[in-house]
């Protein structure tokens, strides 16, 4: 897929469980590249959520070097009936090109490092988050961080780091240094 998911349901990427006086209802939010909303049903005062960040992108021409996976957060959050939650599902980091690093994953991923020598690193995956009481970064209450993009060097690469903080940082741009003769 092209991104992570947020859902109200067990064992899916980003999951919310709305528990009320009736049978619990499950909702899943998939990557769209934009904000989505969820209105808390009447009678519901807490949600069980399962949030995954998106994975990073692959380095150029090194499909066996795996990028980092997004983080996972499971929590129960207090809500108010009728409240509107803002849902942001992170996008997968772009794969590295011959000279240009992979694009940053939607919602906070970092750009992969570029290299003029013909191989560039993958972009970092975007975070998935739930925002309560507004849409600013300071309104984030649950965050599944995105994973790091995989790197490359002259003949191989390094795996991407698994999820970290709120925003990924840009990859480093480097040069290959050969030994002198």
What are these regions (language model features)?
Residues 1-21:
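Solvent-exposed segments in extracellular or luminal domains encompassing
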Residues 1-2, 64-69:
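Short beta-strand segments within Ig-like beta-sandwich modules, predominantly Fibronectin type-III
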Residues 4-8, 36, 71-75:
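Short strand-edge motifs at loop-to-beta-strand transitions and within beta-strands
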Residues 13-17, 46, 84-86:
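Short, conserved beta-strand segments of beta-strand-rich sandwich/propeller modules, principally
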Residues 19-21, 52, 90-92:
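Beta-strand-rich extracellular modules
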Residues 23-34:
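Boundary/junction segments of secreted and surface-exposed precursor proteins
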Residues 41-48, 80-84:
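Extended extracellular/luminal ectodomain segments enriched in beta-structured repeat modules
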Residues 67-180:
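Secretome/extracellular-domain signature
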